[in-house]
């Protein structure tokens, strides 16, 4: 028996008379004569037309109405078809009016009672009155975008989950990287009617200005805010005042606690990312250092000792965690692994890789085998040679952005849906092209809107320190390539198979080519991102499962579907990290924006050497641009850090917080949305000790007495272990863009 799926998702029996009545109304509207035989014939032709769209004895109302339009036109009743289209449009407008007129009662109650998936859309938003205010304003703003700004095709594609337009709840750009050099030269302020601070003359002042700057900018943007060369730019302040290590650590501590204080909408801490050079970059080495807005009589290359002090202080504070041993969420640090990275057994190396082994805090930028250079973070607005057919890579890390660049918005394409509705590979690429066109157009519209608002003063500090969105990308991403391959009848295998991997490469290259087309068409920068998809993977899968009950999703739990992020492997595929890296290395290099390999670990690594060896092995033998080690750990309010996934404290029996990376940052698993929690349960963590690497061997760290001593001192607040760095078991766990506000452009 044939059934109809209505727009509200309900299923009702098919009724041919309803088609007849609708056609009769269209004839009547244009005073066109008709007979019962004509109506019967047209109605039967409609049923024949939509027959191939029937899935499991169910067809949607939209598919039937589309078929009516086609049949009327093909039968020569063009005027009647126009009347029918107008009839549909009028009813659609009525529905949109109802959806636009928000039900304030449900909007508030859904948040208070946590009835809506959007309450946990972002795991950084605390359930609070601030979160309620953000939820309410976000609902209004999202409706404004979909009803007043975007055209019907774009709004429909989002509402029907063909695509996901990110950050609809905010009338702002997505993410931005800022020039720390500019802040150091010019100070904080310059906005009429607002307090202005002179350039910082001391490290403590600069740390306060950075906290305030990031907090201000976070309120003008939806996503991450970033500084590059954090250690390089701060080092001269240490040198000028001849600061002691204790004084440096106090300053860095105030910065870290400052950026972790909830100070933005939704009772959130500013989403901050910093890039640390570790080694003075070549493009900065010979430049005069700047302190207090003035050039000093020494260069950045002369501040190596002070740079090491900044790095040591930062890492020690991150290792110590807060008063309860909880790891700091921000800033997310990205370290540059270059060919001249010093892998020797230094104090800072031991600290860096202990932090990596314990909390999984840092990201690593691979500048050894990837096609990036450390100076790329500063090259966007000053040295950008852009062939409009060339796709430029967005620098700055997974969440970060290079100086004076970023992204104005992100649209993610639902790949499993395309594969499911396509009968052939050709159909797949036609539908992908259509949705990419819709996505690109939506991003152009957004760029025009927020540029107008920038010029009108809605983002005063962005206007002051950036001035233009000309160097910001329009970002298109994808989700669920693994499930797309499973749903595609011409592939029918997941990402662990060669056929799926080759098809994915074909898809990514196709998308890259289309982005080049958009750059030529619109004159803007476009990039391809492996979308983090914190809530998108759940929202799209949930929508698809309701509409297409037999579509293949990632979850083994029928009531909690989700899609695998971007083109990642199934989360339960393997415990061998090198097997996963071998596959992902060929795919992640095809993205031109945020993409990362997460080495999920069940608990902390045995030693800092184990972390260092793994980081080095990946950098020297793989091309993927960004990666991170992600151990799971737990926090007890009474007893602090606990290794691995422990929901109750083994000492006091109280409930704990279990921390893991939800997409790119650590949050308590209890705060995740249902889809990501299902993913966490199905994750297979990597077993480094038993992973088989078949490439060349790199020199590995060995443990010595000095290392033992240093690591013990570093972990003095933790339970004492016989040898923290060695003992197994105990410690497991040609177009030139310039920007008038950029200090580099002014040089």
Segment roles from a protein language model:
Residues 1-106, 468, 684:
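Charged, amphipathic alpha-helical regulatory modules used
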Residues 67-72, 277-278, 460-484:
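Core structural elements
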Residues 90-94, 100-470, 491, 497-651, ...:
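Conserved catalytic cores of very large enzyme subunits
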Residues 631, 643-644, 651-654, 715-721, ...:
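Flanking scaffold residues of small Cys/His-coordinated metal-binding clusters
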Residues 636, 649-652, 723-726, 742-745:
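Short cysteine-rich clusters marking metal-coordination/redox-active sites
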Residues 640-644, 653-656, 729-736, 746-747:
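Cys/His-rich microdomains that often coordinate metals
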Residues 647, 653-700:
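Long insertion/accessory domains within large nucleic-acid-processing enzymes
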Residues 685-722, 736-739, 747:
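Acidic, low-complexity intrinsically disordered tails
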């Amino acid at each position: 028996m044939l059934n109809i799926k209505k727009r509200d998702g309900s299923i009702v029996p098919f009724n041919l008379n309803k088609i007849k009545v609708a056609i009769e109304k269209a004839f009547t509207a244009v005073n066109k004569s008709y007979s019962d035989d004509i109506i019967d014939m047209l109605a039967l032709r409609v049923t024949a037309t939509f027959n191939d769209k029937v899935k499991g004895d169910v067809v949607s109302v939209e598919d039937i109405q589309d078929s009516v339009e086609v049949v009327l036109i093909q039968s020569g009743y063009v005027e009647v078809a126009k009347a029918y289209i107008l009839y549909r449009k009028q009813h659609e407008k009525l529905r949109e009016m109802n959806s636009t007129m928000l039900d304030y009662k449900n909007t508030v109650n859904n948040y208070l009672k946590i009835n809506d998936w959007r309450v946990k859309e972002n795991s950084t938003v605390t359930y609070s009155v601030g979160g309620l205010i953000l939820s309410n304003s976000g609902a209004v703003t999202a409706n404004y975008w979909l009803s007043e700004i975007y055209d019907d095709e774009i709004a429909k594609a989002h509402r029907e989950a063909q695509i996901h337009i990110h950050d609809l709840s905010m009338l702002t750009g997505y993410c931005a990287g800022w020039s720390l050099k500019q802040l150091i030269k010019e100070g904080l302020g310059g906005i009429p009617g607002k307090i202005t601070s002179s350039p910082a003359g001391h490290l403590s002042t600069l740390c306060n200005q950075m906290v305030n700057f990031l907090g201000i900018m976070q309120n003008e943007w939806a996503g991450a805010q970033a500084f590059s060369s954090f250690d390089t730019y701060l080092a001269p302040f240490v040198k000028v005042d001849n600061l002691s290590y204790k004084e440096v650590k106090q300053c860095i501590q105030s910065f870290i606690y400052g950026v972790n204080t909830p100070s933005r909408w939704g009772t959130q801490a500013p989403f901050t990312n910093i890039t640390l050079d570790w080694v003075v970059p070549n493009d900065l080495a010979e430049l005069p250092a700047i302190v207090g807005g003035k050039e000093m009589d020494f260069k950045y290359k002369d501040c190596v000792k002070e740079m090491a002090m900044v790095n040591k202080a930062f890492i020690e504070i991150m290792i110590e965690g807060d008063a309860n041993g909880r790891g700091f969420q921000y800033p997310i640090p990205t370290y540059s692994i270059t060919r001249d990275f010093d892998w020797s057994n230094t104090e800072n190396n031991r600290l860096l890789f202990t932090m990596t082994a314990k909390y999984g805090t840092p990201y690593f930028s691979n500048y050894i085998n990837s096609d990036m250079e450390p100076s790329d973070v500063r090259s966007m607005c000053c040295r950008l040679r852009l062939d409009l057919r060339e796709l430029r890579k967005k620098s700055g890390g997974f969440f970060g952005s290079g100086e004076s660049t970023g992204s104005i918005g992100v649209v993610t394409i639902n790949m499993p849906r395309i594969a499911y509705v396509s009968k052939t590979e050709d159909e797949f690429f036609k539908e992908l092209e259509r949705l990419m066109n819709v996505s690109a157009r939506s991003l152009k519209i957004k760029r025009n809107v927020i540029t107008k608002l920038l010029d009108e003063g809605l983002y005063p500090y962005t206007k002051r320190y950036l001035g233009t969105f000309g160097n910001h990308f329009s970002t298109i991403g994808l989700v669920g390539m693994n499930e797309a391959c499973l749903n595609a009848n011409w592939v029918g295998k997941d990402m662990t198979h060669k056929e799926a991997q080759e098809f994915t490469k074909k898809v990514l290259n196709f998308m890259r080519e289309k982005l080049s087309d958009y750059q030529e068409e619109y004159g803007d920068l476009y990039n391809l991102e492996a979308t983090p998809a914190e809530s998108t993977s759940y929202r799209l899968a949930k929508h698809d499962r309701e509409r297409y009950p037999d579509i293949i999703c990632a979850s083994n739990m029928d009531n909690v579907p989700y899609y695998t992020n971007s083109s990642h492997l199934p989360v339960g595929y393997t415990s061998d990290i090198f097997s996963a890296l071998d596959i992902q290395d060929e795919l992640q290099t095809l993205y031109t924006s945020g993409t990362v390999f997460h080495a999920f670990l069940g608990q902390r690594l045995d030693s800092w050497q184990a972390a260092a060896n793994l980081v080095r092995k990946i950098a020297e033998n793989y091309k993927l641009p960004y990666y991170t080690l992600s151990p799971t750990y737990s926090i007890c309010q009474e007893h602090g850090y606990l290794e691995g996934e422990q929901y109750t404290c083994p000492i006091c029996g109280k409930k704990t917080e279990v921390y893991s990376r939800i997409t790119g940052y650590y949050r308590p698993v209890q705060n995740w949305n249902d889809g990501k929690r299902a993913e966490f349960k199905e994750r297979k963590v990597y077993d480094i000790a038993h992973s088989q690497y078949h490439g060349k061997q790199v020199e590995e760290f060995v443990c010595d007495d000095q290392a033992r001593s240093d690591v013990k001192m570093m972990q003095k607040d933790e339970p004492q272990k016989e040898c923290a760095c060695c003992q197994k078991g105990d410690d497991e766990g040609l177009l030139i863009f310039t920007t008038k506000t950029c200090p580099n452009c002014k040089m």
